[in-house]
């Protein structure tokens, strides 16, 4: 059976390759410090587990969902007003998805025709590229560079490219580069969208993992954002429910409606007990979320301080659960460095090249180990001479 030519657009799966090498080293008895994948090591909160468990006792909850529960959509509306200060979100402006990765991957099928153009950041989370490729669309990259604090710099985007683009993906706090949006940047993005009749698709997965300042927010809290954009909003990292796949598309009603129409053709909706768990997340207390943010900040400090102490350039890490580090010692091949780091130090990270053309020469490190384990990982890097 010949696979679709569409699959030829996708490269090798980096995580699978790294995992195979990791398993081989484990089998040899090597100590492994795995910071490659952004899966929280914190447990889900008790009230969330209880909500899911209780719902699962009801046989009616095991039927096809087909729709979002009205109380779930209302919980999202209320959360946006309470948490982000965004008023005016109505249930018709909310649609669930099985994780925002699935949502971003499918959005292009709802909005793009073959040959349409979208703008994506470089470096970026890989599904931003994949969603365009699946929809037979054309990718145009806009760079995230240290000179501009790894933030979108819309003045540097070719106006003719912007005029052709149907939408622009923005992701802040950013995976993989760890940058956090500012009011000035968001205002520039909104003005840019208006100037070029462009939809903004904002990925907001890490609003509760922001360091050294004000709490993270939402793109939709800025004046004019609801007129030009939508936001993918995830519960995965804030509430440690990555496997439950709980995400939402929120914003412009016509875009949400198109996305909902597509999902209705390929999916029977979110499992009802998971919807109940999502409601518990949205309506529940936030003290544990804040405590967890501080723990991530401790990990960020341990890793960045440790690497800088070895002579690495201090990584960019202002938000998200990732640290974006330049390769030390003048190295340039991120995959080769990751393999060397794994074999010599037992430290597993992700090569920057897997996040787009500008990612080469960097690695992404996930803050999924406690500070004492991070200290041991840094020591293993030192002993291996990788600095």
Language-model regions: role of each:
Residues 222-297, 301, 305-306, 310, ...:
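Conserved core segment of the aminotransferase class I/II
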Residues 78, 331, 340-350, 355-387:
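PLP-dependent enzyme catalytic core of the Aspartate aminotransferase-like
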Residues 2-99, 106, 281-284, 386-387:
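N-terminal small-domain helix-loop-helix segment of the aminotransferase-like
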Residues 279, 295-304, 314-326, 359:
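Conserved glycine-rich beta-strand-loop-beta hairpin in the small C-terminal domain of fold type I
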Residues 116, 137, 195-198, 226-227:
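A short helix->loop->beta-strand "cap" motif at the edges of active sites that frequently abuts
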Residues 110-132:
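Conserved PLP-anchoring active-site segment centered on the Schiff-base-forming lysine
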Residues 28, 135, 195-196, 310, ...:
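Helix C-cap/helix->beta junction micro-motif
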Residues 140, 145-212:
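Active-site phosphate-binding strand-loop segment of PLP-dependent enzymes
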